[in-house]
């Protein structure tokens, strides 16, 4: 089963240019035993645009991100990154593709035994071996400044708040200058003020970097703030994809109920 309700009108905002989509997912299916998680999902996002993927817990939102970044393999369907289907690629080829993508895990996933600076430098150590120590330090400082975490280089993850950990995770995700940024519940577990600050930071990065963003979230308020388009998932399918205004106009009962409860 594919998309149930499709919005034909596309936003004439960022990402609606002559460039090909950064990410195209077509008829993606994924099951774990008898549990069908994704059942024919099709989505796309252009360079410079942001797609927010919404839905209740267990609808496959995070699984979708793991498939896009190549951490899991779909049962069927295709995932094209800048026109190249990554399904079935060899590990070394997938490694090269993954360098073009940044990923922020739901819980920031910082290394507890490393300082903030060491966490942000981690991608450089493993993927930019020719970079000198001074270059690495300068780049780490620039990235931390970009996410508003100046002066935190020597702190441990346990020394900073959840919102700050998300910022450091974002800095690390940006280290290799990705063309695509995947964010898994970037405001989960944060208070409203911290959530708003993360949303503001995402908007800032959108403006400055013009990447393609895919954001998985439960937070409808944040989603409509940061995203050009929203996709609502249920039972492994896209129920509706469009602008927030499109969702408000939709007469599907599930969509109405989701908006009411969010």
Show the residue positions of the predicted features:
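Helix-to-loop junction immediately C-terminal to a conserved catalytic motif
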Residues: 69
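Conserved ABC ATPase "signature" region
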Residues: 84-85, 133-152, 203
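Short coil-to-helix segment of the ABC ATPase nucleotide-binding domain corresponding to the Q-loop/switch region
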Residues: 114-122
């Amino acid at each position: 089963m594919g998309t149930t309700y499709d919005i034909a009108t596309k936003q004439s905002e960022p990402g609606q240019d002559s460039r090909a989509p950064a990410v195209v997912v077509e008829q993606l299916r994924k099951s774990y035993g008898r549990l069908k998680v994704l059942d024919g999902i099709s989505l796309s996002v252009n360079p410079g645009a942001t797609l927010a993927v919404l839905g209740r817990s267990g609808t496959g939102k995070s699984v979708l991100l793991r498939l896009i970044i190549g951490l899991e393999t779909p049962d069927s369907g295709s995932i094209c990154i800048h026109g190249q289907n990554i399904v079935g690629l060899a590990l070394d080829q997938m490694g090269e593709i993954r360098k073009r993508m940044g990923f922020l895990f739901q819980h920031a996933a910082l290394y507890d035994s490393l300082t903030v600076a060491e966490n942000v430098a981690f991608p450089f150590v493993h993927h930019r071996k020719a970079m000198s120590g001074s270059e690495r330090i300068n780049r780490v400082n620039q990235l931390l400044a970009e996410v508003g975490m100046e002066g935190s280089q020597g702190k441990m993850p346990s020394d900073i708040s959840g919102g700050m950990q998300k910022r450091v995770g974002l800095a690390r995700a940006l280290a290799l200058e990705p063309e695509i940024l995947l964010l898994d519940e970037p405001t989960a577990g944060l208070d409203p003020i911290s959530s708003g600050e993360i949303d503001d930071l995402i908007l800032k990065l959108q403006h400055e970097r013009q990447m393609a963003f895919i954001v998985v979230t439960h937070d409808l308020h944040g989603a409509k703030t940061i995203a050009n388009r929203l996709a609502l998932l249920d039972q492994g399918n896209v129920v509706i994809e469009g602008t927030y205004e499109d969702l408000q106009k939709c007469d599907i009962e599930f969509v109405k109920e989701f908006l009411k409860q969010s």
